[in-house]
Amino acid sequence: MFSLKTLPFLLLLHVQISKAFPVSSKEKNTKTVQDYLEKFYQLPSNQYQSTRKNGTNVIVEKLKEMQRFFGLNVTGKPNEETLDMMKKPRCGVPDSGGFMLTPGNPKWERTNLTYRIRNYTPQLSEAEVERAIKDAFELWSVASPLIFTRISQGEADINIAFYQRDHGDNSPFDGPNGILAHAFQPGQGIGGDAHFDAEETWTNTSANYNLFLVAAHEFGHSLGLAHSSDPGALMYPNYAFRETSNYSLPQDDIDGIQAIYGLSSNPIQPTGPSTPKPCDPSLTFDAITTLRGEILFFKDRYFWRRHPQLQRVEMNFISLFWPSLPTGIQAAYEDFDRDLIFLFKGNQYWALSGYDILQGYPKDISNYGFPSSVQAIDAAVFYRSKTYFFVNDQFWRYDNQRQFMEPGYPKSISGAFPGIESKVDAVFQQEHFFHVFSGPRYYAFDLIAQRVTRVARGNKWLNCRYG
């Protein structure tokens, strides 16, 4: 039950939510918004004034703050994309911004720190838990002068434990698939400790929640880092699986830990992957394809989804949707006849129905009839039951209905597509156009007029504007 003090707050949210959701979901969504803003954006739980003296709306301000942090459209309204973000599994520590440090910038005053594993999850062996914790600490030690030593008795700087629901630290867990874990800033007593929700399903794979990834995130808090708004950073608040073999700390997190403790003691300073910025004028794409009206833009470990009916463009890890796929997809196309998409890397390719990978893949690109000299595809596109494959300065054409590579190929790209003089990085088809991407630019090639009708920056498709 809600107290009478919260009634104006709830009425305000009901008004905002009712515009987009049926009556049956209003109360649930209202509770979601209230709980989320209280936990992560410092909305007082006894907040009953809907406006301040200067007329500003407290609820709208907090919603805008949350939307800015996650890169959503800043409306101050609990719309569908905002509610979807609020429902994602995440860390229990409140949000701030940048790779920012914890308020007050607390830090450990020494670089040799101890940790102790107080209990274990039954879902993994003790050895698997110990390995995940050790590897998680090692990420931070490689990037800084910090050294971590495990002890099995006595008082440690950082205590690690699995708890459920209320466990005496004023930050109760909420059961499966909500708040996964939380940690406390450096300090005495509970300071630095990391707690994991015992009701989650912990794994050392891509299934459910990978303990190594969550632990590495929480230890960032234990060392003094707050959440980052960089979606590629380890310190981003929402959980997303990423490939853990040979995982290295992203550059945003390296910058953060070194801002607190200084450079690594290693002779060669570590560098990590940076998250591509959608409106970087030099941005290039690895591959692009349509998918049932959406457009997917692949870059390194990520892809952007452009929705047909919405203005927003959403960025995700490839591994979040397809844990078994490699990063760095090199070519992609949608087969409209079979309602499938095909993704290529090196001499292998995968077939997907919607977002599901079909059994029996990956397969070798030699199945298409390529000579052994072709070991990778630069770009691919489907048009009128034919697939065009671009490799260096040439292209092949495959007959999908008769399933063979057409004779007379490869042909010169510049000869068949006047105005396309450079290597093709990515291409997709809309109506009677091939949208060809080469370097940071894209070329709209009219298949009827047989000429380029527009040249612009490629990331215009990510809603970027230039003067």
From Swiss-Prot:
Any one Pfam family here would be Hemopexin
Q: Which cofactor does it need?
A: Ca(2+); Zn(2+)
Residues where Zn(2+) 2 binds: C91, H217, H221, H227
Q: What is this protein called?
A: Neutrophil collagenase
**Activity regulation, free text:** Cannot be activated without removal of the activation peptide.
Disulfide bond entries? C279-C464
The protein's GO terms of the molecular function aspect are: endopeptidase activity; metalloendopeptidase activity; peptidase activity; serine-type endopeptidase activity; tumor necrosis factor binding; zinc ion binding
UniProt domain comment: The conserved cysteine present in the cysteine-switch motif binds the catalytic zinc ion, thus inhibiting the enzyme. The dissociation of the cysteine from the zinc ion upon the activation-peptide release activates the enzyme.
How are cofactors bound according to the entry's free-text note?
Binds 3 Ca(2+) ions per subunit.
Which reaction does this chain catalyze? Cleavage of interstitial collagens in the triple helical domain. Unlike EC 3.4.24.7, this enzyme cleaves type III collagen more slowly than type I
